[in-house]
Amino acid sequence: MAMDFAKGITEFRWHGRGGQGVVTSNQMLGKAALAEGNYIQAFPEFGPERTGAPVRAFLRISKKPIQVYAQVYHPDVVVCIDPTLVEVVNVAEGLKDDGTLVINTDKGPEAIREKFGVKGGKVVTVDASTIAMEVMGRPFYNMPTMAAAVKATGIVAVETVTNEVLERYPGKVGDLNKVAIERAVKEAKVG
C-alpha cells in the first residue's frame, strides 16, 4: 500500500550503527524518490559517532517543494537496520500513531508491535541479517532493510530503488544487492 502523499511530506527516520550504511540507504531511497519526480531532503545526524556507535539519518519526500529545515521528530516511517539497537534505543520514539515501523529482525511483526507498544499503523519485519549473509556473505543489512521499507510504504517502485543501487554499485556488488533487495521484498512480513 502506497503512502498517502495528500498530507504533504512523508518523513523517515533511520537507525543503525556507524559503518552499516544507514546514510547510504537513506540516500538511495531519496535518489529513487527524486528519480520518480518527488522533492526530497536527505541528511544524516552527525556527532562524535564512530564505527559501531548508534547513528541516525533522516529523509523527507514530497510532491511539492519542502520548506522544513529541522530534524525529523515525529516520523511517518522508522527504519532500523541493526537488530541489536532495539535493545538499547527506543527506535519507535515519536513514530506517528498511523506510522510504519520497519525492523531488521528474525521476530514477527506482532512481537515487535508488543515490544514497542505500537498500537496502530504498520509494523514490518525482515530478517535482513540472514538475507545479507546468505546472498552477500557479509553483514550488509542496509539494502534488504531499505527494500522492506519500500515494500511497506510503496513510496517508490522497487524497480526504481534497485536501479539507483545498481547505478551506485555497478558489477557484482550491485547484482548481489539486487538479489538481496528482491528477496527482502518477498520475505518482509507486514503486520
For the regions a protein language model found, what residue spans apply to each?
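Active-site cofactor/cluster-binding pocket
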Residues: 1-191
